[in-house]
């Protein structure tokens, strides 16, 4: 179970999965993702919104010890470029209300 949620969250942090998952959470997280510095901190609430109270403790721990996550989020700048189009694309079939915010 521990391994599963960790592995699951790993992919969640990857650009592609991140987009599809992020669109499900409040879109305001996207806007916050604009500042690269904040992204590191956004990672915590993002996990909270996505997972609610399922395994927040384990995730929080994972993210704190996963120093690489910070590095992994650096290329988010490239993701940011394809963020708006990708987001509106994903949201298109995900939820029209979110598209308005994106």
Swiss-Prot record:
GO cellular component, one term: cytosol
Alphabetized InterPro entries for the sequence: Keratin_matx (IPR007659), KRTAP_PMG (IPR007951)
Residue stretches in coiled coil: none
Keywords on record: Keratin, Repeat
Pfam families: PMG
Source organism, top-level taxon: Eukaryota
Protein function: In the hair cortex, hair keratin intermediate filaments are embedded in an interfilamentous matrix, consisting of hair keratin-associated proteins (KRTAP), which are essential for the formation of a rigid and resistant hair shaft through their extensive disulfide bond cross-linking with abundant cysteine residues of hair keratins. The matrix proteins include the high-sulfur and high-glycine-tyrosine keratins.
Assembly, per entry: Interacts with hair keratins.
Protein known as: Keratin-associated protein 25-1
Gene: KRTAP25-1
